[in-house]
Amino acid sequence: MTAHSFALPVVIFTTFWGLIGIAGPWFVPKGPNRGVIITMLVATAVCCYLFWLIAILAQLNPLFGPQLKNETIWYVRFLWE
């Protein structure tokens, strides 16, 4: 269940930012700043995709969990049983 719930957003966002970074430059009109606009589109797509990917991967496998005292753990265990 976890693999499917994680794979779908990754595929959707990869496709979305891939289209912006790859297909977006084809729609930039010709002009003196065309190269700058294409560079901005590709750089924006790469940066936004990397930001999203790092954020989603950090939530998927956190480095540390919540820090609870022993009394809190025993209390929660008592209430949930």
Curated annotation (Swiss-Prot):
Q: Which UniProt keywords apply?
A: Cytoplasmic vesicle, Glycoprotein, Hydrogen ion transport, Ion transport, Membrane, Synapse, Transmembrane, Transmembrane helix, Transport
Residue ranges spanning the membrane: these are 8-28, 36-56
Q: Which GO terms describe its cellular component?
A: clathrin-coated vesicle membrane; synaptic vesicle membrane; vacuolar proton-transporting V-type ATPase, V0 domain
One GO term under biological process is: proton transmembrane transport
Q: Which residues lie on this side of the membrane: Cytoplasmic?
A: 29-35
The cross-references to InterPro entries, in alphabetical order and at most eight, read: ATPase_V0-cplx_e1/e2_su (IPR008389), ATPase_V0-cplx_e1/e2_su_met (IPR017385)
Q: Indicate what this protein is called per its UniProt record.
A: V-type proton ATPase subunit e 2
Biological classification of the source: Eukaryota, Metazoa, Chordata, Craniata, Vertebrata
